Amino acid sequence: MLLTLHAATGAMLGEFASTPAAAFGLGFLSHFVLDMFPHGDRMIAHDTKATGNGKRYYWLVGIDAFAALAIFFPAFALGRFDHPWLAYLGLLGGLLPDLIVAIPEYALYIKKEYRVRLRWFYAFHVYVHDQLIRVFDGMPLKIGIAFQVILLALMWRLWR
C-alpha cells in the first residue's frame, strides 16, 4: 500500500479524533484495514527478496515518500488541518506499522536480538496483508497504484 495513502488516512482520521491517543490509535488501526485490500505491490516485495535486486521497489518507496512529503508539508505549513497535532499523530500512526515491519526486514545493521523481538508484529502484518490479497494475487502494480490514487483522490475530495 502506498505510504501516501496510509499517511492521508491516518491524518484524516486523526483530524476527527478527540484525543492524541485516539488520533494515533485510529491511524495505526487504519493501516491494517487498508492493507487488507489488494494493492499490486506484493510481487515486487517477493521479487526483491528472491533476487536481492530491490531497485524497483526502492524507487517506488522513494517516489511514494516524496509524494507524501509534497502533499503533507504544504498541508501542515498552510494550516490545512483544523487540528494539526491530532492529524500529525494520526499520520504517524498510519505509517508506523510499515516502519516496524521494515526494521526486521531491511535494517540488518540493528542487532539481531532486537529484530527478533519484532517478528511477532511482522507475522501479524503479513497475515493481515494476505487475507484479501490472496484472492487478487496476480494484480498488476499499475492497477494497484491506480486503485490507490483513485482512493486517495476520493478521500481528498470528501475531506475538502
Where are these regions (language model features)?
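N-terminal membrane-targeting hydrophobic helices
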Residues: M1-R160
